[in-house]
């Protein structure tokens, strides 16, 4: 991003505390259909980043710039429409084609193709399942189901759990 990304912006909470926005990390559509932004707070670790609706933020220029950059990298690829060739007797069963398409759609469900996982920032329990907060090499962060992260990035998951593991000496308990 340009030099504007280093600007500081404010958010005010009801207690009149002012928090400075260091960086906008990601964007999503919230439950109410409103745009929410993943905010990196100045003076706080990235693990304290939070999703905030636009109306809670006073950093209009920073949000507009992020949206311009976000729209550049999120443009859909247009496909040319051509006539489909007549099916031949050699072609595979249409049911098999549907299964393959379904499998491909599952792989693209989280839009992770080509993304390199930089690190796992945290772990949380959502409704019914665990989710990892993952940071990618392009400095975006996403909350993903643990099943998806376990299958795509198993070594990173092990590394994350190892970093959180504490081992106690059983002999120390006897003293």
Swiss-Prot record:
Organism field: Caenorhabditis elegans
Protein name (Swiss-Prot/TrEMBL): Chromobox protein homolog hpl-2
Gene: hpl-2
Pfam families in UniProt: Chromo, Chromo_shadow
Disulfides per UniProt: none
Predominant location: nucleus
Coiled coil: none
Biased composition, class Basic and acidic residues, residue ranges: 99-109
Ranges annotated as biased composition (Acidic residues): 88-98
